[in-house]
Amino acid sequence: MQTVLKYLLLIMCGSFCASEELQNQTNVPAIFFSYKLTPGILKYQEDYDRAVTLPRDTFIEAAEKFLGVCNADTYVFINQPGLRKLDFLEFETEFVSLQRYIRRSSTAIKFEKVDLLPQDLYYDLAEFVKEYCNVDQVLNLRGNNTEDFQPFIDSEKRVIIIEYPKLPEDTNERKEAFRHYDKYLRTILAQIPSPEQNVIYTSLNPGTTLAHESIIPIQIFPDIFDIKSRVGEVEQNNRVLDVPRLSFNDYTPRFSEPPSEYVSIFDSQLIENNRGLLQLIFTILVGYILIQFFFTKKTIVDEKITNKKDNVKQTSPQLLKKVQEIQKKPSQQVS
């Protein structure tokens, strides 16, 4: 259905372009998108009627609300002079990178018609961010020169203001310009270390447009923003996943450990489980002690008897000799 509607709008646009001259713009389109969820900003989209031009004060209020949450590491303000809402229909296929970044964002809103904005708006918003979001550095880049941007790897917050050249009026040249600027945007955003970026894309320098463009019911990337509106305020880039904690079974050792470091023989459970074995060990031990006792005693007695006999054998000749001497003494006295 969206595809058919696009073709019908292109046919209607072609008929107007062939028959009408261009006139100065009285309003400009605008897009906000942020990688992280920006709470409270979606109500500006819900309250917006694309048939009516959004007042400048309401736009600035929405921009400050969008930036004041301070949920980004880099704030990118893109000024595309001469941008008109018809470009998003006629050159939709050239906005490849822009659409991809909007699609992956958590918050995205768009306004097809906004009152003409001050040319110094981005500098005012940069001061607002510096004051409320603790940002020190502001980088100003020419949108047609990649050499202006020096890649950085630190974690300091920054404001980047991209000033594209004014779009040409020729259709083919305008198409080529959008393709080139889209690639430039991809080059810059891809080199920013953190994906947490808040981006505002609009025109601060109005150009020309069709006299009856306001009556053409053009929407900015309806395939993307219709989904964003239906989803509502949902964080789509939450790095910390909200998942239940993993549950693990209690640790159980493969083999049950003993109740203490040392096994005691007085453990009642040990005695009960090994009663027969303990009785056998005790009987053998007692028998061994008795055998050792009686065998040792018999050996001692035998040794004493042997020693006594040896002593008797050794002393008998001496006693005999002494007796003979005693007997000789009386006989000598008689003579």
From Swiss-Prot:
Topology of this chain in the membrane: Single-pass type I membrane protein
Signal as UniProt keyword: yes
Transmembrane regions: 276-296
The species this protein was found in: Saccharomyces cerevisiae (strain ATCC 204508 / S288c)
Protein name, UniProt field: Protein BIG1
Gene: BIG1
Modifications the protein undergoes after translation, according to the UniProt entry: N-glycosylated.
Topological domains annotated Lumenal: 20-275
Cytoplasmic face residues: 297-335
Residues with glycosylation annotation: 24, 144
